[in-house]
């Protein structure tokens, strides 16, 4: 039996297969560039692990207080080496990316301080953390003020607006690297470095924190290599390599990470406590696999862009642009298009492939959200998934794929569902 015959049994028509094959021929150069990036980052991870003498003992579980957990502590040294920082906090007790960001903000902002976003509104789930939407326990409730500077019409930074917004109260600047549920560009490490340098010129002691979610290992450098004081992310995204069952990380300056550790546990305890509960093998091996897993996800994003831009849909970024994160936005023009696309992604999943995704009122979001994810780890967006809020311009956000071939199947299935619904013609 041929591969195409297997695909046919899974519901992918020859028309879709032929279309996909034709599209693939045009993106070979992008795939070569992605492979080169993966090779660089793989070498970086191996070097950090070798320098820190990873051994089988580092995979041992710890319980209770977690005192003297060398596996946990060594992993944090490895993260610090990869990110070029003084320290890192890498813990299963950090439950998600939003939690990691909330932790970093709450640890380093005090009453009377001001938080500034120079890239417009933050990701939806941070609205409650900051207090944009009144929420118990928010930064606003603790007397931390917030302001944001909108991007210019072309998606670039409004430097004059940023200069005007920075004042004596501005303590921390939060920069979201990835587009989130928006159709603005995601930013390169070089662009982030330019923005951080400008902010430091405006106020030398301001803390610059980058929300690094979805961007790790997509480029050769990380934001902390170009001046960021902290980089924050989730282990069920890129750096967990699809194996980490939970967790988050914060890498940065020692004093800032120490404050994060005290906020995560308790003042006086900090990083000395926090049992690993047996997740170290997954954390280490997931990090080891992450460069190639991220490369697979980026290839899937490029293939998605190439297919849908050929059909006349607006895609951000285009198939020819150099990638800055693993997310691919496709504006599908209608609620029906979003639903059909997500049904295709779900149908390609190894887990819950029989489930039909539908829009629902998801906590933390103002609009209904549709999510397709047949994942081994719940909510792991490094695994093949697609989601988006049901609102204009009806953009769906495709990400993940632990292997390129799974990402490819997901795209083909999305095309098939769109074709079956009469929403595209091939």
Kindly give the residue locations of the regions a language model identified.
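Structural motif
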Residues: 86-90, 113-116, 171-172, 205-208, ...
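N-terminal small-domain helix-loop-helix segment of the aminotransferase-like
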Residues: 63-71, 75
